[in-house]
Amino acid sequence: MAQPDDALRLAPEILNHYREADEAGRLGRGSGPLEFARTRDIVLRRLPARALDVIDVGGGTGVHAAWLARDGHRVELIDPVAEHVMQARDASAQRDAPFTAQLGDARNLPFGDERFDVALLLGPLYHLPEPADRAAALHEAHRVLRPGGIVFVAAISRLASFFSGIRNGYLDDPRFFDIVLDDLVTGRHRNPTGEPEYFTTAFFHTPDLLRAEVEAAGFRVEAPVAVEGPALGLAGFAERWNDDAWRRRYLERLRDIESERCVVEASAHILATGAKLA
């Protein structure tokens, strides 16, 4: 049985950030709809055409678990934040295609070996600043996957704070400028300011480091791809996104160039896909 969330060894500021944030609504506002649409598209293009056993590690309030269950997959969600698990269970109970949700730690999954066909890690890596913890989470995903199973691993780009600062005017704050410098040099994102817009303790990857970490866990890895791409730097992005024709064109073209290095590095999130060798 998973232990209460304050025993799951996440930094207190991370737990507090998610307890206070509206994680359930995040992918429905701002740049969230683009992140959701692209993540879903990337995953769908790589899933086998059959019902699958899926573990959604760090699955939050169940935004991705919900559509996967609706598509006919059997989904088990794990998250270290008790509030997220309760919201995920409530969301599941209101759906015709339910999924399960429980407290758990990405570094110590409460399942036996070779239990799942697919593992989603769409958040754990960037809230595990220590390399050993990220390695443990990836090895756990490898352990619970069946031979030939697929892992999807999301990371925040090393340049994400810099682009966010340009877009939102945060670079005018010298404290944020120092945060960006630390991100670029070390990948370690720390926010001593108390400003929630500056995010919480995290680790930001380069594409090469993300690929290397997933490979080190025993996966055969595709080149990481951009999730949002460069659109978040566009003035008036929300208005453009609500234009059906513009949105369709952007998503079509981004799919064509999603693995180009410059596009990957310009994206706030990047996604690696790995396969467990049979």
Task: Name each model-derived stretch.
Residues 2-50, 63, 67, 87, 150-183:
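Conserved class I S-adenosyl-L-methionine
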Residues 55, 62-108:
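Class I SAM-dependent methyltransferase SAM/SAH-binding core
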Residues 107-119:
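A short acidic, Gly/Pro-enriched loop at the edge of an enzyme's catalytic core
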Residues 118-132:
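A short SAM/SAH-binding and catalytic strip from SAM-dependent methyltransferases
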Residues 128, 194-208:
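Acceptor-substrate binding/catalytic loop of class I
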Residues 135-147:
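A short glycine-rich, Lys/Arg-flanked "PGG" loop and its adjoining helix->strand segment in the class I
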Residues 213, 217-278:
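C-terminal lobe and adjacent flexible extensions of AdoMet/dcAdoMet transferase-like proteins
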